[in-house]
């Protein structure tokens, strides 16, 4: 077992926060909802104020989802590249919200676009974290056919994060959709293999396998719960821990 796998959330010092693009659109159904972006930025600030180093990956599904484009006849690689560009837009929006709160932030893109984001250079990104800057990794892995969940797991490993925090609309991993089934059971702990075998939908299989192979815990929690992110890192809160 790796050192990070044996730690509890209350002892983490560097984490990856993964959120979906849909989390930024509020109730409007599409695009960016500035008050929602600002609320999430405030949650990130509350953790940053604890001295914890923060990486972020944000999906792009509120603007464009590559798989949907592919299903409608678009070439998959082209659709995925469009989805990557959507993640850059979301990253810039989050950067603006964080810097409005006086949090130094860097957007780091896997696809070069030097006028708006830094290129991904691992050692430079680590140095940003050491200087307590929030690093938002955009454009996925830079390659089609990989999800932003896989990108978050990859970057979390490269940055030596102690866990991935997957912010969702529910407070953990359930055996079935709790919004549809009142008798749904929430797991406090679940293994990577159980997630894969039971199709629990935490992340895609590639991301789960990459986390499993590197003993990287995944903490699934509700991003809609005020103070939830900070609470878990302070040693309390409701969540599911995915581990080996």
UniProtKB/Swiss-Prot annotation:
What's the protein called, per UniProt?
Uridylate kinase
From which source organism is this entry? Paracoccus denitrificans (strain Pd 1222)
**Which reaction is recorded as catalysed by this protein?**
UMP + ATP = UDP + ADP
According to the UniProt record, one GO cellular component term is: cytoplasm
Localization, per the record, is: Cytoplasm
For this protein, the record's InterPro entries field holds: AceGlu_kinase-like_sf, Asp/Glu/Uridylate_kinase, Uridylate_kinase, Uridylate_kinase_bac
Q: A GO term (biological process) for this protein?
A: 'de novo' CTP biosynthetic process
Kindly give the CDD domains that the UniProt entry links to this protein: AAK_UMPK-PyrH-Ec
Q: What is its main location?
A: cytoplasm
Q: In which pathway does it act?
A: Pyrimidine metabolism; CTP biosynthesis via de novo pathway; UDP from UMP (UMPK route): step 1/1
Q: What class of enzyme is it?
A: transferase
Give the EC number(s) listed in the UniProt record: 2.7.4.22
**Record text on activity regulation:** Allosterically activated by GTP. Inhibited by UTP.
Q: Which residues are listed for UMP binding in this entry?
A: 60, 80, 141-148
Subunit record text: Homohexamer.
UniProt similarity note: Belongs to the UMP kinase family.
Name the positions where ATP binds.
18-21, 61, 65, 168, 174, 177
Transmembrane regions listed in the UniProt entry: none
> So what does this one do?
Catalyzes the reversible phosphorylation of UMP to UDP.
Keyword Nucleotide-binding annotated: yes
GO terms (molecular function) for this protein are: ATP binding; UMP kinase activity
Per the record, the domain of life is Bacteria
């Amino acid at each position: 077992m790796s050192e990070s796998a044996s730690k509890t959330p209350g002892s983490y010092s560097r984490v990856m926060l993964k959120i979906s693009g849909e989390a930024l659109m509020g109730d409007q159904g599409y695009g960016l909802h500035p008050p929602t972006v600002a609320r999430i930025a405030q949650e990130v600030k509350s953790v940053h104020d604890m001295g914890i180093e923060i990486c972020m990956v944000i999906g792009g599904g509120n603007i464009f989802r590559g798989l949907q484009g592919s299903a409608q006849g678009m070439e998959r690689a082209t659709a995925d590249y469009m989805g990557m560009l959507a993640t850059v837009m979301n990253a810039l929006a989050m950067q603006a919200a964080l810097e409005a709160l006086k949090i130094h932030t860097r957007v780091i893109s896997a696809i070069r676009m030097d006028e708006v984001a830094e290129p991904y250079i691992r050692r430079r990104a680590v140095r940003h974290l050491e200087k307590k800057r929030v690093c938002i990794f955009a454009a996925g892995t830079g390659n089609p056919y990989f999800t932003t969940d896989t990108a978050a797991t990859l970057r979390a490993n490269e940055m030596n994060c102690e866990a991935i925090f997957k912010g969702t609309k529910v407070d953990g991993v359930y055996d079935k959709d709790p919004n549809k089934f009142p008798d749904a059971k929430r797991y406090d702990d679940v293994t990577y293999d159980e997630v894969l075998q039971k199709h629990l939908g935490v992340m895609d299989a590639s991301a789960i396998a990459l986390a499993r192979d590197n003993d990287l815990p995944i903490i699934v929690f509700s991003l809609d719960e005020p103070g939830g992110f900070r609470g878990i890192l302070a040693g309390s809160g409701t969540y599911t821990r995915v581990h080996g």
